[in-house]
Design a protein with these regions (language model features):
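Basic, polyanion-binding surface patches
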Residues: 1-160
Length: 160
C-alpha cells in the first residue's frame, strides 16, 4: 500500500522511471503522472516523450520501476537525470546512484519508495485528441508528443 501524497511525490519531489534493455539500465526524471484504478487494478500512468532514450527501454520491457527519492537530498541528481541522456553517458553512475533489482526489474537503490510496474496500455498523445488547445500549443509546439503508459503496480518496496 502506497502511503505517500501522489500530488506532492510526482509533481514536486519527482520520480525516476527505470527500465532495462539488452543488459543495460536507463532512468529518467519525470514529474507528470497519475495513480488510480483501472480494470480493477491499482495503476500508475507515466508520460514519456517519444524522443527520450528511456522510452526505448520501457518499450522493450514488460515491467519498469518508479523510484521516489528524497528531493531535498537528491535534487541535484534528479535534475541531472532529467536533462542528460543515457545515450551520451552512464548517467546513473555519474549521478552517484546505484541500481538494484526486484526480479529482473531495475530500480534506484537510494529511493525511499519504489513501485514495480507491469505495462498494461500505451498510447501516443495525438493532436486531435486535445480538447485544451492551449495545452497543445504550450507543451507540444515542437510536436514532440508523449506516450502514456498505464501499468499495474505489482508491488511496492519501502525503505525501512
Amino acid at each position: 500500500e502506497y502511503k505517500g501524497n501522489v500530488f506532492n511525490d510526482i509533481g514536486k519531489k519527482w520520480m525516476l522511471i527505470t527500465a532495462a534493455k539488452d543488459g543495460k539500465v536507463n532512468t529518467m526524471t519525470a514529474s507528470w503522472g497519475n495513480m488510480g484504478v483501472m480494470w480493477g487494478k491499482d495503476i500508475v500512468s507515466v508520460f514519456i516523450r517519444q524522443t527520450r532514450f528511456t522510452k526505448e527501454f520501457v518499450d522493450n520491457a514488460d515491467c519498469f520501476s518508479i523510484s521516489f527519492l528524497d528531493h531535498e537530498k537528491y535534487a541535484k541528481e534528479l535534475s541531472y537525470l532529467g536533462t542528460v541522456s543515457g545515450r551520451d553517458e552512464d548517467k546513473i553512475n555519474k549521478a552517484n546512484l546505484h541500481v538494484e533489482f526486484s526480479g529482473d526489474v531495475p530500480y534506484i537503490e537510494e529511493a525511499d519508495d519504489v513501485m514495480i510496474c507491469k505495462k498494461m496500455f500505451r498510447q501516443t498523445m495525438e493532436p486531435d485528441a486535445f480538447i485544451d488547445k492551449e495545452a497543445l500549443e504550450k507543451w507540444y509546439s515542437d510536436k514532440n508528443y508523449h506516450d502514456m503508459y498505464m501499468a499495474s503496480i505489482e508491488h511496492i518496496l519501502e525503505k525501512k
